[in-house]
From Swiss-Prot:
Pathway: tRNA modification
Organism this protein belongs to: Cronobacter sakazakii (strain ATCC BAA-894) (Enterobacter sakazakii)
GO cellular component annotations of the record: cytoplasm
Protein name according to UniProt: Sulfur carrier protein TusA
GO term, biological process aspect, one: tRNA wobble position uridine thiolation
Length: 81
């Protein structure tokens, strides 16, 4: 079984940050990425379980994978056009 979270193009450590900081940091990081690149987000704010998927839907990026059963939460986002 392959680890979908292995070898992302970029990593964002949002541990210890609380809403709305994680999503603000994701937005800033994604702006500087090229289409098709991936971003691994590591967070421990329970609000990210709602905010990160919502951000991906709203901005039309792909949420490739998420792990929210245990801390820290992990999300893998792929930037679209």
């Amino acid at each position: 079984m392959t680890d979908l979270f292995a070898n992302p193009d970029h990593t964002l450590d949002a541990l210890g940050l609380r809403c709305p900081e994680p999503v603000m940091m994701v937005r800033k990081t994604v702006r500087n990425m090229q289409p098709g690149e991936t971003l691994l987000i590591v967070a421990d704010d329970p609000a990210t379980t709602r905010d990160i998927p919502g951000f991906c839907r709203f901005m039309e990026h792909e949420l490739v994978a998420s792990q929210t059963e245990t801390l820290p939460y992990r999300y893998l986002l792929r930037k679209n056009q």
